Amino acid sequence: ALLIVAIPVILIQLIITIVFFDSLWIKTNKGMTRALVSEIQTFIEVYSNDNYEKDDIKNIFSLYQDLNIEFIEDDDFNFSYDERWFSPIDRTLRRELKSKFALEIFWFDTTSYKELVDLRIKYQNGYFKFIVPKDRLTSTSARLFGLWITVPAFIVVIISLIFLISSFS
């Protein structure tokens, strides 16, 4: 009799959690990643304009956009690319970068630093190295969302079990 109440509630809660969490998390991360890649594209466009001082542009973007930017003069742009297809952050970043830049002119690493992403984009006779905080690409409220969904589910199950037990006595 207890299973008649508990199992449907737990199953519905699991399905709702997975569907909403997945949809919300992916949409949020996609929007954040798209904004970051657009900022990087804007930086490169402004940097290409000779009307502005290059160091001032880097300083402004570093200060206001939280981007650590360095231009490295090196004609060699052949970084070993570790494809992590099962990482949502990597997949979303790769997709957004492909939409703005050619595949062979960007490279990124999300695993070397715990809280940072190393992103490099080829530019003329070198490349830009962007060090970006990982929280610019992904929402950190996933655990909070999980608790927000799980705790009420357990409370509802416990209350329903109490009512079920009291109805038998």
Feature names for model-found ranges:
Residues A1-W85:
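Juxtamembrane segments flanking the first transmembrane helix
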Residues F20-F21, F43, F61, F71, ...:
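Phenylalanine-focused residue identity feature
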Residues R84-P152:
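Extracytoplasmic
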